[in-house]
C-alpha cells in the first residue's frame, strides 16, 4: 500500500499579516503616559485606546469616571452630562470618527501643562488644549480649544487613568468651541 502525502509547503514561512491596529501604547504606569496615550488615541483614531485612558466605570474596584463640561455647554445641553460614563465617551468618539475621512489626521495639542498636587496615587493635571477633528459636518467647527483639568489616579491594577475630567472655556478664546461642545454634538 502506498501513501501519497501532498502539502502546501508546511515548513515554509508565511508572509505575516498586518495587524489591524498598529498603535503601540505603553502601559500607563505613570500619569504622564496617560497624556501620551490620549494624544495617540486621537491621532490614530482609536476608540479603544481613548477609553483606556479613562477610569474604567465598569470595574467595581476602579474609581468612577466623571466628566464635567464647561458651564455654557452644561446649560445648553441640560441633562446630557448627568450620567456621562466611558460608554458615552466611546459613543461620541466613534460617532465623530465615522464622520472623519480616513486620509485626514486628528490632533490634540496640550500646552501650558501644569502638574499639581502630586501624591503617590494621584495628580491634578491642568492644560490648555487645541483639538482638531476634521469631520464632515459643516455646521460644527473642526477645531475646539479651552482648558482642561484632569484628576489622574492610580487604579488597583497599578495603572493610571483619568478619573475626573473638567473642561473650561477660556475668556479670551477666539475659537469659542470647547471639547464639551464637540462631545455633546456628536454623542447622538
Where are these regions (language model features)?
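Short, low-complexity N-terminal intrinsically disordered segments enriched in polar/charged residues
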Residues: 8-44, 52
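Acidic/histidine-rich, surface-exposed loop or edge segments in extracytoplasmic proteins
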Residues: 14-22, 35, 63-78
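Short beta-strand edge/turn micro-motifs at domain boundaries
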Residues: 9-21, 122-124, 128-188
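Extracytoplasmic/secreted proteins, especially bacterial periplasmic and envelope-associated proteins
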Residues: 30-33, 37, 49, 84, ...
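Sec-exported extracytoplasmic/periplasmic mature domains
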Residues: 43, 55-59, 94-102
Amino acid at each position: 500500500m502506498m501513501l501519497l502525502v501532498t502539502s502546501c509547503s508546511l515548513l515554509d514561512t508565511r508572509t505575516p499579516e498586518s495587524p489591524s491596529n498598529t498603535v503601540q501604547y505603553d502601559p500607563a504606569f505613570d500619569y504622564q503616559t496617560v497624556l501620551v496615550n490620549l494624544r495617540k488615541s486621537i491621532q490614530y483614531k482609536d476608540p479603544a485606546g481613548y477609553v483606556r485612558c479613562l477610569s474604567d466605570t465598569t470595574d467595581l474596584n476602579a474609581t468612577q469616571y466623571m466628566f464635567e463640561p464647561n458651564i455654557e455647554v452644561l446649560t445648553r445641553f441640560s441633562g446630557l452630562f448627568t450620567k456621562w460614563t466611558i460608554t458615552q465617551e466611546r459613543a461620541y468618539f466613534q460617532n465623530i470618527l465615522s464622520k472623519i475621512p480616513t486620509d485626514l489626521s486628528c490632533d490634540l495639542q496640550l500646552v501650558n501643562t501644569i502638574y499639581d498636587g502630586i501624591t503617590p496615587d494621584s495628580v491634578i493635571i491642568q492644560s490648555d488644549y487645541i483639538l482638531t477633528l476634521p469631520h464632515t459636518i459643516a455646521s460644527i467647527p473642526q477645531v475646539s480649544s479651552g482648558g482642561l483639568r484632569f484628576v489622574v489616579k492610580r487604579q488597583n491594577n497599578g495603572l493610571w487613568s483619568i478619573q475626573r475630567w473638567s473642561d473650561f472655556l477660556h475668556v479670551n478664546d477666539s475659537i469659542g468651541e470647547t471639547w464639551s461642545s464637540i462631545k455633546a454634538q456628536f454623542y447622538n
